[in-house]
């Protein structure tokens, strides 16, 4: 699960109203299109509303929130959205130090250096959402 830290973030949100993906996309993931990084937060109804890993089929519209509009704000992200280097895990994340960057598969990976361009995140706190989670500051925009 990926959540905004404060509801006021929706007041300044930038949504691409015509964003579609050429491939299937998992809800609650990250997607970069045309150099813009989005967090995909579609509203899901019915039986799938509270399930993890709900797939939005290729060609369907996406609620893609442009992360550049939220620079300096925070997201809360479950650990399941983070990939680690071999042998590393949640215990290796250090608040105030660990950096994360989006991967092409929609998850975030731990990185030791900030990318030269594009959105990345700095872990500010370790918290609990539906399990182990982190609060991240949106940076690099």
Regions picked out by a protein language model, each given a short descriptive name:
Residues 1-141:
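Surface-exposed, low-hydrophobicity beta-strand/loop segments enriched in small/polar/acidic residues
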